[in-house]
Amino acid sequence: MAILALKVLDKDSNTICVSSGEDFVDLVCTHTYEEGDRIVLETDEKNIHVHLQVDDALGDAFVYITDNVSYYVPFGEKRISMSPKVFSGNKHYLYAEVAREDEITVYRNLALNPADQHMDVPCYPHATANVETRGESVFAAKNAIDGVRANRSHGEWPYESWGINMQDDAAMKLDFGRPVLADKIGRASC
């Protein structure tokens, strides 16, 4: 059994909301997020698969964590690559649940992570790149693995992508945090 705790902290690390449990924790936080707020998942076990929902509008992310995870609530330009519903309002439902063995071994998209962040965190899969157009969030590498597939435009959600700034040497790295076995790469969408 893993002891899990979810916390919402303000910019000064003061606790706004907190909940804990064994193998599952959920948290209803009645707070309007402010710049600098972050969501923290703490666990007494490392290197585990969990279902993590940092916001009900973002949905469930099946992730592999190697340590405690801090998710910084995005504001301003960092929000335009996300649904306008994400992190809005004053009532938020978050949860984390340790994955069962059958969920870990089932055939699935190993790269999907709607909760990936632009910064390095101990939460995988995680996408990084050597270039992202103008450093804008709508062109961040994480957009390639968030599950949003709208591609008939670009500039703001849902039309976000990995932008290579027309560079021939553009490269993306997808880190799984552990060795994985894959037999397919990608799915084209029109």
Task: Describe the role of every protein-language-model region.
Residues 188-190:
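Conserved small/polar residues in nucleotide/adenosyl-binding loops
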Residues 167-169, 177-186:
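Extended extracellular/luminal ectodomain segments enriched in beta-structured repeat modules
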Residues 1-38, 43, 47-175:
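Disordered, acidic Ser/Thr/Pro-rich linker "stalks" and the adjacent N-terminal cap
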